[in-house]
């Protein structure tokens, strides 16, 4: 379901410009080519404050192009077409424009000059391919096709973004209709080069946009949302509600559009009151700009949630990692990373402190102790996380003692090893403090366990509060990960529907922290 709650009767004329997009091409209608141009244009026009009222797709028929363009041109301020501009027989946009405006076609010498600049390169390319016969005729036909445009056309020369020079090829405009190429690369480039000419900064309508995410289904609050929209009926506010079925962090996205900062703030407050306790500060790239996001997260937990004890744990763990990063060079620090939830917390903390001191481009050193019959999903997550977080992960056979020996042999300079061990872990219970040297009969490393005193709930609160990506097995009912031979979905998360079908709740829904590892047979 998709819902839009319009808190506006009709925009007063002359305030916000309107536009229609006409996509032209049989290949779009046949499904042989995917249209990405309308999506690109909608995003760009929307950011410019233009109200997109319509998207139409028509085939390569002159009458269809003419009819759609004529209708849109009289109804909206701007019409942007894409496709049907080129040298072949089925490129009929210019013919359709001439028909729509009862105009004649003529040959443009200005376009011919632009075409002539490309011809030597084209001819040389064909000759290098051994094609010489008939090339002059091809050039003649191509030139005639590209240069034949409606007589009333205006040629728009854009500004190249790289060097500020005039664009190399013009775009045809007839009345309020702008004809862009259909090839996405050229369509996007042409729009970029013409944006400020078509939509001067001083003429743009100021618009304010915001997005709020919630872990509620939209059915849970749709009636109350309609009431909020009604309260702002006279303030030109538009609230959109969009369900998301596959996102692990939120279920519904709300968008707000308005013309004033005052009404935006009022709507934002109203929606946050409506969704209190269920707002998600969604972040699709949690591994970027980590320092600022970390500060904002702690502030929310302290000010909004009054979660003093949790913030204290965050800061204690942060301080431990910070001390290690300050004390040791990065080539002496390694992170034990097996794709589990605890070491994922550590990965984010280490990335945060490395970003703070060295910058995001600095790589992190890590290693993975392999387990027998490892879940392929865990392996894939390690690969993905390594790419996101810029961590170089070595693999060593297990168990841990043998793996550490392999690490020290390959990287003898390693001293501190960050681990996601907690006091409730089978091995974590032997640690008295978060930072300890290994026993004398082990490879000598400094074991650093910043979240030693965290609970299962603490781990999930941080991961989900910052939208840190984690292994998808945790959303399938697994609460602790080992190998496939000794790990099952947690029985406490099993749900049986009325039709007898079963499914499992995600791991963060487990209420009893003490049962975290009861889905593992070897612990």
From Swiss-Prot:
Region (FAD synthase): 332-489
A Pfam family assignment: MoCF_biosynth
Cofactor(s) required for function per UniProt: Mg(2+)
Keywords: ATP-binding, FAD, Flavoprotein, FMN, Nucleotide-binding, Nucleotidyltransferase, Transferase
Entry-linked SUPFAM superfamilies: Adenine nucleotide alpha hydrolases-like, Molybdenum cofactor biosynthesis proteins
GO biological process, one term: FAD biosynthetic process
Assigned EC number: 2.7.7.2
Keyword Nucleotide-binding on entry: yes
Catalytic activity: FMN + ATP + H(+) = FAD + diphosphate
Signal sequence range: none
Keyword Transferase: yes
Family assignment from sequence similarity: In the N-terminal section; belongs to the MoaB/Mog family. In the C-terminal section; belongs to the PAPS reductase family. FAD1 subfamily.
Name used for this protein in its record: Probable FAD synthase
Species assigned in the record: Caenorhabditis briggsae
Gene assigned in the entry: flad-1
